[in-house]
C-alpha cells in the first residue's frame, strides 16, 4: 500500500552536519600529497649455489663477517666489507629483478611479484603457507658462486686488501663455514698456562662455536664409576701419581726398558725373540731385577698424568671421529692431550692441527695460580696449585720435550693476543697446504714438520713486517704495482710485484724474475697504504715468487735479502737465492737461528731445564702484533659507530695507533730533512743521497694525505 504523501514528508531527512572549519583545507592537502612509497625490500640472505650442488648455502651478514675474519681480515674491516657486499647485491639484483619481472606483471599474482622483487633467478619458489618460510623467500637472493666471489673480492680490493692468492683463501674459508671441510685444533699444555682463555678467543676469531675441554670429558666419565673403584679418574692430573703403586710403576718401567734393550740387541732374530717372549710369558715378572729402584716424585707425577690421559683419550678419539663425519670444526684444549697420544690421533684424523702451550717463566706461572685459588694467595697451605707446582712444572717439561721430538709448535703464552694471532695465521696456512694435497702428519718420522714449518714462517714474517708499514707503490716511469714494506725513514725493506688488474690481489708471476734482478734503488712516484690478511703475519704468503702458500718460501728467503748494514736501501727481490754476497747475511742468520733446526728439535733438552733459550730471548720473540682486533664480538650498532669513527679519523689506516704514529713521526722526519738540506748530514754517495731524500720527502707527503683520504662507502 503506497504511503500517503503526508507520511512521506512527515519526517524530512536530517540536514548534513556543518562542515568543519578546516575540513576542506585538510582534504586539499591530502589530495595533493602522494602516498608514501613502500619501503625498499630487505636483503637478509644471500643463497650461494654451485653448479653441481642441489642446495644453496645461505649467507647472512654475521656469517659473511665471520668468513672474512677466518681468512685474516680485521674485525672492523670484515664488518664493513660484509655490509658493502650486501648493499651491492641488493642494488644490482633489485634492478635486474625489476626488469625481468616487468614482462610477466599482468599474469603474475601480486604475492609472486613481491617474492621475485629480490630474486634475480628464482629456481622454483613454492609459496608456502608458513609465514617465516615466506619471509625468508622474500628476503633471499640466489647467486652463483662465481658472482659471489667476484663481489666479495671487489669489496676486499676497495678496502685495500692485497694478497698473493686472495680469492683462493676466501674460497677456502667458505668451505670451512659451509661445513664442506673441517679442522680440529688441539691446544696441549699443563695446568695454568692459559689454554681455556686461548681456546675461547681462538674460537671467536675462527668462528668455531664448539670448544671442548678434556676436563669435561673426564667429568663425564666420572658419572659411570665410583671414586673408590677408580680413584685415578677422580684425581687431578698433577697429583694423579699418588693413586699409583710406586713399586708396580717401577717394575713396569724396568720391563719396558728391558724389552727395548732386547730389541736393540736382537733386531733381526725374530724366531729367537718369539721364544724369549714365550718364556717371559710363562715366568711373568720373575726375571725382573730383585731390587728395582723406585722412581722419584716428579716421575710419579708424570706417570699418573700419562695414566689418566690414556683413559680420557679413547673417548676423545670417538668424539673427533663423529665431528669429522659431520664436517664440524672444533677446538679441543686440555692437559690430557699428551703428545704421544696426539700423534696417535693424527694417524686416524687428518683434520687435527696441534699446538703446545706453555709458560717458560716459573714465577709468571705461579702468579697465574694466585687468582685461581679460593684465596688469592701464593701460600701452599691455601693454594693447592702452588702446593703441587713442582709436579705441574715437571709435566710441562715432559710435554715440551715431547713437542720438540714430534716438532709440535710451542706457544710461549706470555701475551694472549699475540698467541691467538700466531695460532690463527698458522692454522690457516696449514689449511692451505692441506688443500693443496699435503699431509700435515708424517707417518715415517712420526712428526708434524709441516705445522712446525708454518709456525716458524709466521714468526719470521711477523718479525719482518713489524719493522715498517705496508704500502702499494709504483716506481717512476713504471706501471707495475709493488706491495712494499716502508720504514719510517722512507726506505723500502722488501717489495713484491702485484697484479692489480685482476681485482683479486694476485701476484704477477711474469714479473717475479725481474724482481730478483732489479732491486729497488730507483725513486717511486706513487704510494698508498694497503692491508694484509693476518696483519704482519700475512707476509709469509708473499715469500715465494709464484704467490703460493708460505711453504714455498722459508726463513732462508729472509736471510738472503740484500740488506745493507746502514739500513738505507733494501732489496726488492721476492725470493732471493740461497747464496748471497750481502755483508749482513751472518747477522741475519744470527737473528733467525733462535728458531732452531729440525735436527735440534729431535734432541729434547734436559729434563731439569724448561728450554734452551733465556727469558730475554723469549721476551724478544713474544713481541708480536695481533692480526685481528681483539674486540671481535661487538654488536652491529657498535660496529656502525666504529665504522663512522674509522672513516672520519683514520681514512685507509686500519689502526688508530698506526695513524697516530705516522703523524708523530712526520714532524721528526721533517726536521731531519731540513737538517740534511742545510748540510748537517754529508753523504758520499751523491746521487744515491738525492734518491734517498726524494723517497723520504715523498713518503712524508703521502703520510700527511692519509688522514684526509676517505674510505669508499661502507
Swiss-Prot record:
<feature type="compositionally biased region" description="Polar residues">
    <location>
        <begin position="659"/>
        <end position="670"/>
    </location>
</feature>
<feature type="compositionally biased region" description="Low complexity">
    <location>
        <begin position="1"/>
        <end position="11"/>
    </location>
</feature>
<feature type="region of interest" description="Disordered">
    <location>
        <begin position="1"/>
        <end position="42"/>
    </location>
</feature>
<feature type="region of interest" description="Disordered">
    <location>
        <begin position="595"/>
        <end position="689"/>
    </location>
</feature>
<feature type="compositionally biased region" description="Basic and acidic residues">
    <location>
        <begin position="271"/>
        <end position="285"/>
    </location>
</feature>
<feature type="compositionally biased region" description="Acidic residues">
    <location>
        <begin position="595"/>
        <end position="617"/>
    </location>
</feature>
<dbReference type="Pfam" id="PF13671">
    <property type="entry name" value="AAA_33"/>
</dbReference>
<dbReference type="GO" id="GO:0010264">
    <property type="term" value="P:myo-inositol hexakisphosphate biosynthetic process"/>
</dbReference>
<protein>
    <recommendedName>
        <fullName>P-loop NTPase domain-containing protein LPA1</fullName>
    </recommendedName>
</protein>
<feature type="region of interest" description="Disordered">
    <location>
        <begin position="259"/>
        <end position="293"/>
    </location>
</feature>
<feature type="compositionally biased region" description="Basic and acidic residues">
    <location>
        <begin position="618"/>
        <end position="636"/>
    </location>
</feature>
<comment type="function">
    <text>Required for the accumulation of phytic acid in seeds. Phytic acid is the primary storage form of phosphorus in cereal grains and other plant seeds.</text>
</comment>
<dbReference type="InterPro" id="IPR027417">
    <property type="entry name" value="P-loop_NTPase"/>
</dbReference>
